[in-house]
Design a protein with these regions (language model features):
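Positively charged n-region of N-terminal signal peptides that target proteins for export
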Residues: 1-4
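Hydrophobic lipid-interacting interfaces of membrane-associated proteins
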Residues: 48-50, 76, 178
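Non-transmembrane domains of secretory- and envelope-associated proteins
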Residues: 23, 148-156, 163-217
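One face of beta-strands
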Residues: 39-45, 56-62, 67-71, 155-157, ...
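N-terminal leader/targeting segments and the immediate start of mature chains
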Residues: 11-55, 202-217
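Extended beta-strand-rich segments in extracellular/periplasmic secretory proteins, especially
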Residues: 114-176
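Beta-turn initiation residues at beta-strand->coil junctions
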Residues: 47, 73, 89-91, 172-175
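An acidic-aromatic
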Residues: 61-109, 181-182
Length: 217
């Protein structure tokens, strides 16, 4: 479940990624829009791991505002109000509850922390053109400021934009174990902030008695 959770929560990472130093005009404009908006999008992904010839695939939807977010994909729901994160597996009837870590080593698996501390999370190392989904796109290549040593930590990130625009169309995430996830983004929308944090908070009373809840707070 751990790798699947990382894949799903990493989707919100597509909205994070900048650095304290200089950045490309495209990335800077995109981040400015993200920081001032309620952002929603749909995604699909494929993940290739070194140990397997087959690919893991999936799809889902995301809604994010500041340090709060909701993700629904591959049978998992992830709710975060900026303080507590719930991961719900409806099929297995399992729930994991965690506090949002404030330490820097939480960046790799905590998209909310990446966004709330966006200036500390990534450095943009290059910006240019690339091929994505058979089309020429603009590509921003980023590396974590604080590189984790775990095999599940993020080694690198690429954000792909429609050529000449700030429209995010996809991303590529590489983990230290050599796994590569490729995301396609659709239905990206920016609306005025305004949702209460409570709307991103999971109501544990909705879980049935059959659920196994692991509380790590």
């Amino acid at each position: 479940m751990k790798k699947t959770v990382i894949i799903i929560t990493a989707v919100a990472l597509l909205l994070s990624g900048v650095q304290s130093g200089a950045k490309s005009r495209t990335l800077g404009a995109f981040i400015e829009k993200v920081n001032s908006s309620l952002v929603s999008f749909d995604y699909s992904f494929s993940m290739q791991t070194p140990a397997s010839k087959s690919k893991m695939t999936g799809k889902g939807k995301v809604k994010i505002q500041g340090s709060s977010f909701f993700l629904d994909g591959n049978g998992l729901e992830v709710w975060c109000d900026g303080t507590t994160r719930w991961t719900i597996d409806r099929f297995s009837e399992e729930a994991l509850v965690e506090s949002v870590e404030e330490s820097s080593d939480g960046f790799a698996t905590n998209p909310a922390l990446m966004i709330s501390a966006v200036d500390e999370a990534f450095d943009e190392v290059s910006f240019g053109t690339a091929k994505f989904a058979g089309k020429t796109v603009d590509a921003s290549s980023l590396t974590p400021v604080l590189k984790g040593k775990s095999s599940m930590d993020i080694a690198g990130l690429k954000l792909f934009f429609k050529s000449g625009t700030t429209e995010l169309v996809g991303a590529e995430i590489k983990l230290n174990d050599g796994s590569v996830s490729e995301f396609s983004i659709s239905g990206l929308s920016f609306s005025a902030k305004g949702q209460e944090k409570g709307s991103f908070r999971f109501d544990e009373k909705t879980l049935g008695n059959s659920y196994v809840v692991t509380d790590l707070r």
